[in-house]
Design a protein with these regions (language model features):
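Bacterial N-terminal signal peptides that target proteins for export
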Residues: 1-11
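Bacterial N-terminal signal peptides
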Residues: 10-19
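Sec/Tat signal peptide C-region and signal peptidase I cleavage site
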Residues: 22-26
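Predominantly soluble domains enriched in secretory-pathway, periplasmic, or organellar proteins
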Residues: 27-411
């Protein structure tokens, strides 16, 4: 009998406690814990790709929790006469502003994630074109959201400066000239927002640098870096001390020391590729244990193990990835937890096994040919709570965990 009374008492207390918790949550304007929605994992893909060859327009949204099934296509609100729109050049988001930003060869648009409506359009400004396909408007190449979540660093359209853009209004706050790296294209920014490593499609054959290192807060150029050929995609390690770049005429990559501005080493992939093409895709796992490099000549991705401080990668043939879609529109970004990689040819890879797990398709079941400009976005209760970035860069916490050390924040 005593046992029964104890059980009844315990049950009563539990019910009272749960009721109290629910009441307090309601008074604070919070949902009861039992009603909190699970996190949703979505993929946002900005289209069209190069020259509109994928017959796509707008931002395609897929549900990663349901085998990447189609959810929605967000319109750029263009008239039919301007469809499908210019080639997309970049994508980023702001958590504080709950905004999605898409850049193209001609304009940049901000989209409210709560309504999926265009909030503003930045059209750049008239400028001499430095390179074929550059937009006469001067807008825009890759964007990056700075740590304040409200300011964007955005490349001019294959031109000689970088914009600082107000994420709320689309107003140009500042233009930082980079005359020695005068064909703005790619960039990566350190987590603390102090350094930007910006890639330029300018050639050392013409006496120009391939990378400009920017002091972001002070809006100045610290130094330029030159590699063996024109720089293509790039990535950086956790603190921005090393930059890894693809260059013309190389299936592989080169490493540069950001502090000294010097190129350190060159790594060539095995196989028959010389004179046939070059890598256009490079990234690393968040813990920096692996470097992935595209090989469009042989339709595969090479993987280098990356021990120690990241200056001496070791090629690992056993990890080679052969996507079913091939390797043409090469790019790579990874989820923040390092579990998934999204390749630029519509394929999702399980990072641990190096195996393909999905091919991304639109509402008509067509493979989305160009997925270079895509993000993994996590939502809860309709709010964006986490985002990765366009470039598979190193992460300080993941790197420290692998190395058994502490980050500067943890020390």
């Amino acid at each position: 009998m005593k046992t029964l009374r104890k059980a009844l008492l315990a049950t009563t207390c539990a019910v009272v406690a749960l009721s109290a918790t629910t009441y307090v949550s309601a008074q604070r304007g919070q949902r009861p814990l039992s009603n909190v929605e699970p996190v949703r994992h979505l993929v946002y893909i900005a289209t069209p790709g190069d020259n509109g060859t994928d017959n796509q327009s707008g931002v395609v949204v897929l549900d990663a929790d349901k085998d990447y099934s189609f959810l929605k296509r967000i319109s750029y609100e263009l008239p039919a006469s301007k469809m499908p729109g210019p080639k997309v050049s970049g994508i980023t988001v702001s958590l504080p502003l709950q905004m999605l930003y898409v850049t193209t060869d001609g304009w940049m648009k901000a989209i409210d994630l709560a309504t999926d409506k265009v909030v503003w359009t930045f059209n750049g400004e008239s400028a001499p074109v430095e390179r074929t396909r550059g937009a006469a408007s001067g807008c825009c190449e890759r964007p990056w959201t700075l740590p304040d979540g409200k300011t964007l660093l955005v490349g001019s359209s294959y031109n000689s400066w970088w914009y600082y853009i107000d994420g709320a209004t689309g107003k140009s706050l500042f233009k930082l000239p980079t005359p020695e790296a005068n064909v703005a294209h790619n960039l990566a920014v350190t987590a603390d927002g102090k350094l930007a490593i910006t890639g330029s499609m300018s050639s050392p054959k013409n006496g120009k640098a391939g990378v400009a290192v920017l002091d972001v807060p002070n809006r100045t150029v610290l130094r330029y870096m030159t590699f063996s050929e024109m720089v293509r995609p790039l990535t950086i390690n956790h603190d921005g001390s090393l930059v890894y770049v693809n260059v013309n005429d190389l299936v592989g990559f080169e490493i540069g020391d950001v502090k000294t501005g010097k190129m350190l080493k060159r790594f060539e992939a095995p196989g028959d590729w010389k004179g046939k093409g070059y890598s256009h895709g490079i990234g690393m796992t968040p813990d920096e244990s692996e470097i992935w490099v595209a090989d469009p000549v042989n339709d595969l991705w090479h993987v280098w193990d990356n021990p120690g401080d990241g200056r001496n990668p070791v090629y690992n043939a056993s990890k080679t990835i052969k996507p079913s879609a091939g390797v043409e529109h090469s790019w790579i970004d990874m989820t923040n937890d390092g579990k998934l990689a999204l390749l630029g040819d519509s394929v999702v890879i399980d990072v641990k096994t190096h195996k393909e797990i999905a091919v991304l398709k639109d509402e008509f079941g067509r493979r989305i040919v160009h997925t270079e400009k895509a993000l993994f976005l996590n939502f809860q209760d309709g709010k964006l709570i986490e985002a990765n970035n366009q470039f598979a860069v190193g992460d300080a916490k993941a790197y420290a965990a692998r190395m058994g050390t502490k980050t500067s924040e943890q020390q």
